[in-house]
Amino acid sequence: MQLQLIITTPNGIFFNEKVDIVTVVTAGGHIGIQYGHQPLISTIEISELHINTEGHKDYRICSINGGLLYVEKDKANIITGAIEFKEDIDIEKARREHDYLVEILSNSKNKDSDYFRNELKLKKVINRLKISSNSTQSPKK
């Protein structure tokens, strides 16, 4: 049996398929969710997310900008502000964002709300760059 995985962003449904396992990083660490998992509600960290579907040897790798996870016996719902498959990451754009944010943060005189917002943006960009440079092969659809 497989788990129905639904990933929703502000732009709509990002992913809605049956999967063998989805691996996420929660505040409590890495967890793998499969069909029959105990009910769970948790936050998801800015991290790498792995999806393994039947017929794929390798995991689909995603960059996720944090979110919420709600698991029932046969279904997992993830709500996130942003997620993208590894192969869809625009590396040049991410590098430009990284350089821009590093410059802004290094020139900040005080740690106000803008500083912390930019620091969070930088964590998200670093995650995208790390995932895009990861040598793990992810299958194309």
From Swiss-Prot:
Family the entry assigns: Belongs to the ATPase epsilon chain family.
Q: Where is the protein situated, by its record's location annotation?
A: Cell membrane
Name any one GO molecular function.
ATP binding
| Name of the molecule in the record | ATP synthase epsilon chain
According to its record, how does it sit in the membrane?
Answer: Peripheral membrane protein
Subcellular location, principal: membrane
Q: Which domain of life is it from?
A: Bacteria
Q: Where is the organism placed in the taxonomic lineage, from the top?
A: Bacteria, Bacillati, Mycoplasmatota, Mycoplasmoidales, Metamycoplasmataceae
From the UniProt annotation, give the residues forming the signal peptide.
none
How it assembles, according to the record, is: F-type ATPases have 2 components, CF(1) - the catalytic core - and CF(0) - the membrane proton channel. CF(1) has five subunits: alpha(3), beta(3), gamma(1), delta(1), epsilon(1). CF(0) has three main subunits: a, b and c.
